[in-house]
Structures are given as C-alpha cells and as structure tokens.
C-alpha cells in the first residue's frame, strides 16, 4: 500500500472508457515470453519446459508463425530501446510487421525523453511515438508497443522524487520504507 495514489489519471480513465485487467503469466522478467503469448495467443505452458524463449528458439526457425499482426492491413512494432534483444528484429519480420521502430533502426524513435536519472526512455515518450503512428494510419493498424520506463535494474536513486511515495503497512522494513 502506498501513501499516495501514483496513477490517479489512469484510474479516472478507467471510469470513462473500456478497460479491464490482464493476469500476467510472468513477473520480474521474461518480457519476450509475455509478448509471444500476447501476440500469438499460445500459452507457454503448452510447450516443453526445454523451450524457455520462443522468440529465439522457435519463431526464428519457422517459416510461418500465426499471430494477431497478420489480421491487420498494417502492423508496426515500437520498442524505445535496442531491437536486437530476444531477436526482436528477426521475430517481428517473421510475424509480418511492416515496420519496427527502435533505437538505431532505420525507422526513427522521434521522441526520446527520460525521467530523472533513468537510463530508459519514458512511457510518455513511448506513447507519443505510438500516437504518431496512429495519426499516420489510413486504415486499421496494429501497434505492438513495448515500453522500458520501469525496467530493472534500478535503485532508490532512479528517480529524483523517490520520497514522494512511501510504502506503508505491516511487514515493510526500514530499508524498503526509506
């Protein structure tokens, strides 16, 4: 529990728009696996445990990989970080994405704002880049947006305002609270 609500605007939007929750099959890592499951609809529990990362071990070796991007006239991927991790540049090609925007790609990340001392581009930056795509689309378009703002590792010096939100409740030690 936090002393202040860090996302009041999001909560307000949820009251006025269609929203919901998704139960993540992973926490604290495995981003590419969550992407794979979201884009294909295939849960990793249906695969052998010897296949820990489908992006690098399955998708890059198959000619056909069914996924949601194939259902749209245009598909764009945006990841405001490096594109090579988990073989995303190859995976998105095989999935049929028309363009992949990442740092260093021929399709440029236009907005590049960071928050405080974070080494990663902000969610605001990611959303602005995605909104540019929405504005340019003439027909239906699928956008796969993978953000980086809250990616580990980070410590208490990650943000300048780390004292704005204080964890409260039982079981929180002084190290965590401070």
Descriptions of predicted regions:
Residues 2-178:
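Solvent-exposed soluble domains appended to multi-pass membrane proteins
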